[in-house]
Regions:
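Structural signature of hydrophobic alpha-helical transmembrane segments
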Residues: 3-17, 54-73, 113-123
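N-terminal signal-anchor module of multipass membrane proteins
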Residues: 1-36
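Hydrophobic, lipid-facing residues on alpha-helical transmembrane segments of integral membrane proteins
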Residues: 11, 15-19, 44-48, 52, ...
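Cytoplasmic-side transmembrane-helix entry/capping segments in multi-pass membrane proteins
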Residues: 32-45, 64-70, 86-101, 118-121
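Hydrophobic alpha-helical transmembrane segments and adjacent interfacial helices
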Residues: 49-58, 74-83, 99-113
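C-terminal ends of transmembrane helices
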Residues: 18-32, 72-91, 124
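Membrane-interface module
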Residues: 20-28, 94-97, 108-124
Length: 124
């Protein structure tokens, strides 16, 4: 059952993703000719997926967590490949690397290490 502590961990994971996504939008990474895939909603969902993966790891459901993390990573890789297919795109993978870091911070928050995840988000 989802208790208040787990909900707080998941909420932290979503807030981390949301903060990173808002920063990416504000700095112009999602707009223009070289716009990337991730905005506030995308990064919030990636943080939530990571949070759920961390929660499943706490419940000893490592396979479910691995599927969630692998699926999020495949999504990021597919977005990068799609961006590189555009003829006017310069090679840059900053947004994609940050997306994978957001998933990792979500996992950290989902495991219960909210302070560590939040401090890492402040550095990103």
């Amino acid at each position: 059952m989802l208790d208040l502590a787990i909900a707080g961990h998941l909420f932290t994971a979503v807030l981390i993703g949301l903060a990173v996504g808002i920063e990416r939008e504000w700095s112009g990474h999602t707009h223009g000719p070289d716009g990337r895939f991730g905005g506030a909603r995308t990064f919030a969902l990636l943080g939530l997926v990571g949070g759920f993966a961390g929660w499943f790891l706490r419940l000893d459901h490592a396979l479910t967590a691995a599927v969630l993390i692998g699926g999020a990573t495949l999504f990021v890789v597919a977005a990068y490949r799609a961006a590189m297919q555009r003829p006017d795109t310069t090679p840059d993978s900053t947004t994609e690397v940050v997306a994978i870091v957001v998933v990792a911070m979500g996992v950290t928050a989902g495991l219960g290490f909210r302070t560590m995840a939040s401090a890492t988000a402040a550095l990103v």
